[in-house]
Amino acid sequence: MARKALIEKWKKTPKYATKAYTRCRICGRPHAVLKKYGICRICFRELAYKGEIPGCKKASW
């Protein structure tokens, strides 16, 4: 329940620009968000594994 409230709070325009912070667009996670994609590392990993992120593939060496 708290997460839903925080996601709704995040969607609103902040009173001051410095109060804005990044959240994952898919799951709402506030930590480890990749700014370029706007999603967290966990969602990024899942989407990259499925091949849904263009130009990205899992590294293996």
UniProtKB/Swiss-Prot annotation:
Entry cofactors: Zn(2+)
Record's keyword terms, sorted: Metal-binding, Ribonucleoprotein, Ribosomal protein, RNA-binding, rRNA-binding, Zinc
GO biological process, one term: translation
Example of a GO cellular component annotation carried by this entry: cytoplasm
Cofactor binding summary note: Binds 1 zinc ion per subunit.
Gene Ontology molecular functions: rRNA binding; structural constituent of ribosome; zinc ion binding
Pfam families in the cross-refs: Ribosomal_S14 (PF00253)
Positions bound to Zn(2+): 24, 27, 40, 43
Top-level taxon: Bacteria
InterPro entries assigned: Ribosomal_uS14, Ribosomal_uS14_bact, Ribosomal_uS14_sf
Coiled-coil intervals: none
HAMAP family: Ribosomal_uS14_2_B
The family this protein is said to belong to: Belongs to the universal ribosomal protein uS14 family. Zinc-binding uS14 subfamily.
Subunit structure: Part of the 30S ribosomal subunit. Contacts proteins S3 and S10.
Entry function: Binds 16S rRNA, required for the assembly of 30S particles and may also be responsible for determining the conformation of the 16S rRNA at the A site.
Record protein name field: Small ribosomal subunit protein uS14
Organism name: Clostridium kluyveri (strain ATCC 8527 / DSM 555 / NBRC 12016 / NCIMB 10680 / K1)
Phylogenetic classification of the source organism: Bacteria, Bacillati, Bacillota, Clostridia, Eubacteriales
